[in-house]
Structures are given as C-alpha cells and as structure tokens.
Amino acid sequence: YCTDKIDCYLVKLQIDKMGHAMYGYLFYPKNAKQGSHPVVLTPPGAGIKTIKEPLRNKYYAENGFIRFEIEIHGLDPRLPVETFQEISKGFNDANGGYLANGLEDKDRYYMRHVYQGLVRCIDFLTSLPEWDGKNVAVQGGSQGGALAIVAAGLDSRVTQCVANHPALSDMAAYVEKGRTGGYPHFNKYHGILQNKDCIHTLAYYDVVNFARKVKAPTYLTWGYNDNTCPPTTSYAVWNTLKCEKESLLTPINEHWTTTDTNRKQMEWIKKHLIK
C-alpha cells in the first residue's frame, strides 16, 4: 500500500499479557521527519472482517498525519475473505456474536480487552519518534465511532476526537417502553435485556458512560434516517459530552457518510491541532 507520497507498514500489536493482539496498517507521510507529525488512531466498524480498502483514506498521510487503522480481533487482514466469512459464521452467531460474549460479567466481557487495547495503541503511536509530541486524534464510524469516543474518555492524551454515528450508545434504552436503543440492538436477542447482570455490563461499557469523561474537542456526525445507529442514540452521546464540541447533522443520511463528510473530518482535525 505504499505510494510515491506515503509509506505503509502492517503492524501486529500485542495488547496484554494474555496474548490478545490487534493488527493495523500504519501510514506515514513519505520521508516523515522526527517530532513532526500528529497521529490518528482509527478503530473499525463492527464485524469480523478484513481492514477495508486501506488506501481509501490515504489523504491523511498525504496531509502530514501518521494514521493507524486497526482491527480488533487479532486477525491478520491478509487472510482470505473466505476465512473471515467462516470465522464470522462460527463465532459471530445470531445471539449477539462477540458483542454479547461475556455480558453476564463486566470483568469478562469481550469488549474489555478491546477498550484496553485502544490505550495500548495510543501507547504505541506516542512512542513513534516521528510523533509531534502533542497531537493524538481518534477517528471512526459506527463501532469505530464508539471506540473513538471510548478512547478519548479513557486516555487524556487524546487531543481531538471525531466520531460518525457511534454504535454501542444507549444500548439498554429498550428496557424502557417506547425507547429505541443503540446498535447492536440487544432487544433482538433472547434474554439479554431480562438479565440484570447483562444490563449492568451494557451500562458500564456504553459509549455514553465514556462520553462524560471526554476532554478533547469532539466532532460528532449522524444522520436522521439511520436505522442501524438511530439518531436518538447519537443525541444521547451528544447531550452527555461536556467538552468543546461540534456536530454535523445530515437529515438525508442513513448509516453512511459521503466522501465530502469524511474529508471534512480530516480538515476539522487539522484545524484543531495543537501548534
């Protein structure tokens, strides 16, 4: 994935003593200089799949950013598509998949090591000699948007946060009659919202719980026609954020963003860089 303007490295990062790992493509500006470049961590959307079209956001590195686009399951993105499909069928089952794995105990929930891994990724990025020593941005959409906010809530080193229609937000809202909860919509899965331990875990790992801790300037976007991550759940996050914040609401959008919106996010980060 190297070009005449950027360099790319595939990184496998061990995130804990248990052996959990995350893979990611690390993009550098060509001839990156020591102490000169802001870093951007980009977590993935939901699912068990490869890292989608790594060069689609090459303009970050072309504009001077070091960008680390990750997956969260410890699966080499070079594996064949068929392998990812088989793994997904085997482990991402019809009762919530990995997002329901271990919900009965918040200390054993699958997303625990994922959330911790975000901090480990920031450890890695801030250890790079080319990092400018000041700017750590997080950026993502859907599950990636959720993880961007979680990272900003967990780690005070984050200086800019950008999230599209964050998933994992207001997940237990379905417990109250007439309310819509966030992705992955646990009302569809047998018994989860009738289990008090599961509800406690959902509240603990909910993006809203981390949004209250975010200090970095935050740019949040969502669409009114999104049935995957309903706009009410993005409002729950927005209303909880107490940091400097800016929003982009797109009434026509479903669960997608335009290339213009994606590019504007990078421009927003540039505008908010610490000089």
Where are the model-predicted features located?
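N-terminal cap/lid segment of alpha/beta-hydrolase-fold proteins
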Residues: 1-35
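Short beta-strand element of the alpha/beta-hydrolase
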Residues: 23-24, 28, 35-46, 67
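Cap/lid segment of the alpha/beta-hydrolase catalytic domain
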Residues: 55-116, 173-182
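Gly/Ser-rich "nucleophile elbow"/oxyanion-hole loop immediately N-terminal to the catalytic nucleophile
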Residues: 97-142
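Hydrolase active-site cap/lid region
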Residues: 145-194, 249, 257-260
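Short beta-strand/loop motif that positions the catalytic acidic residue
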Residues: 214, 220-222
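Acidic catalytic loop of the alpha/beta-hydrolase fold
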Residues: 224-229, 255-256
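C-terminal catalytic histidine-bearing segment of alpha/beta-hydrolase fold enzymes
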Residues: 235-275
